[in-house]
């Protein structure tokens, strides 16, 4: 409630201080119909195979004639037929922005993207992932912040104060899909900081370009956006869903240094993201198949991660008027198979075709290969504008192979999604 009142007060004060006699007002938005289909039978009888949902997003902007002042509000909401956790709303943006020459200040709720790579974004840490919107991590929740930026010929320096934390949501424990084999209790979260969602997180970022190189350096100090999922103790403490104990999210204190580099060399793009982070994590519990639990001690873990690769574009491919891009990236985590995510030692390969037609037709085909287990997954995204106001998007994701390492241990991440292939169709109307 306090956050909502503060944002309302901010918006009213900002609007009253802007010159009203020539205020520019922009209003736009979209409404989306989404259909999802899971061709394989669900793990549990209460889970559905077909989902329909409606989503809407609007953007309202107030701009002063000088361009120095702006208030932008962008709410988002979705209603899902079966997944109650996916039926949610979010304030993507609700900010006042002031620009004066090389100086810029932003106060309110905003979204910030850092990074250059295609398959995995390591340095992108400001906003929490909107996990129920899409499993690829591309959708983000709005983050309350105060941001100051200064640009000069020596580069751009930005400082962020992040006073409120957003938890990560998970699919409905009874009906939601895709289901990764574990169920998370969204109602119970644990924070190392002791302050809960009230945080004193901060971040710094420096950006500059040197000839063909675009370079970013970043530092983050605060609550980790990605939680460690723990078995509660006793296991039945959070209750059962579909006969399984529900896991609980633990958000550790995190410090992270990041580097992102992109070199543009004609038709070539060379990309790199690297991070070094330190945080406390609960140790594996042998009573629960070495899954970490709240009953285990905490140890400090320092982790080095990197991802990078190349992208080459064939412009006017075979004189067709279309462009074909080839993407190849490698993803590394020094923990390899012990990493709490599937990107420990993987290669991503992609093809991006754009028709360059009035309908903005584009197709993206991607594949991930785990070099330790030979597990493979495939994704396809195709989009096309229909007339002036509609866009159709088709997406499909398949776990093609579930492999095992040299010791015969099955790839747990691939096995968890083996029966969760899905197709998604979206029809969006823009106004």
Task: Say what each PLM segment does.
Residues 33-41, 70-81, 92, 129, ...:
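Transmembrane beta-strand segments that form the barrel wall of outer-membrane beta-barrel proteins
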Residues 41-47, 78-82, 130-134, 188-192, ...:
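Extracellular loop and loop/strand-boundary signature of outer-membrane beta-barrel proteins
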Residues 48-56, 87-92, 101, 140-144, ...:
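Residues that define the transmembrane beta-barrel architecture of outer-membrane proteins
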Residues 61-177, 211, 397, 401:
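Outer membrane beta-barrel
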Residues 148, 310, 415-431:
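Outer-membrane beta-barrel "beta-signal"
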């Amino acid at each position: 409630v306090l956050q909502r009142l503060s944002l309302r007060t901010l918006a009213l004060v900002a609007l009253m201080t802007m010159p009203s006699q020539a205020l520019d007002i922009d209003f736009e938005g979209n409404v989306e119909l989404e259909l999802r289909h899971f061709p394989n039978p669900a793990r549990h009888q209460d889970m559905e195979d077909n989902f329909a949902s409606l989503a809407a997003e609007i953007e309202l902007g107030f701009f002063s004639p000088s361009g120095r002042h702006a208030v932008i509000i962008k709410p988002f909401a979705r209603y899902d037929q079966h997944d109650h956790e996916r039926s949610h709303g979010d304030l993507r943006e609700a900010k006042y922005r002031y620009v004066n020459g090389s100086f810029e200040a932003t106060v309110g709720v905003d979204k910030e993207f850092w990074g250059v790579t295609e398959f995995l974004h390591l340095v992108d840490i400001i906003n929490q992932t909107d996990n129920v919107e899409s499993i690829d991590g591309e959708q983000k929740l709005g983050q309350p912040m105060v941001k100051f930026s200064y640009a000069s010929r020596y580069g751009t320096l930005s400082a962020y104060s992040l006073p409120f934390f957003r938890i990560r949501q998970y699919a409905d424990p009874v009906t939601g899909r895709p289901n990764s084999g574990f169920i998370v209790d969204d109602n119970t979260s644990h924070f190392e900081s002791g302050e809960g969602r009230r945080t004193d997180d901060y971040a710094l970022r420096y950006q500059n370009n040197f000839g063909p190189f675009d370079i970013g350096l970043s530092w983050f100090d605060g609550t980790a956006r990605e939680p460690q999922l723990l078995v509660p103790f006793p296991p039945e403490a959070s209750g059962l869903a579909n006969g399984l104990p529900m896991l609980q999210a633990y958000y550790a204190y995190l410090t992270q240094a990041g580097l992102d580099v992109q070199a543009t060399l004609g038709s070539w793009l060379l990309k790199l993201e690297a991070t070094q982070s330190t945080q406390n994590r609960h140790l594996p519990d042998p009573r629960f198949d070495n899954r970490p639990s709240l009953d285990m001690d905490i140890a400090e873990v320092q982790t080095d991660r990197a991802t990078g690769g190349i992208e080459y574009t064939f412009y006017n491919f075979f004189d067709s008027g279309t462009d074909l891009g080839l993407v190849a990236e490698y993803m590394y985590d020094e923990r390899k198979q012990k990493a709490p995510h599937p990107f420990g030692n993987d290669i991503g390969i992609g093809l991006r075709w754009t028709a360059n037609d009035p309908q903005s037709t584009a197709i993206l085909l991607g594949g991930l290969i785990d070099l330790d287990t030979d597990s493979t997954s495939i994704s396809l995204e195709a989009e096309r504008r229909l007339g002036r106001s509609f866009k159709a998007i088709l997406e499909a994701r398949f776990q093609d192979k579930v492999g095992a390492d040299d010791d015969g241990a099955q790839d747990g991440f691939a096995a968890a999604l083996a029966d969760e292939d899905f197709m998604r169709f979206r029809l969006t109307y823009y106004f």
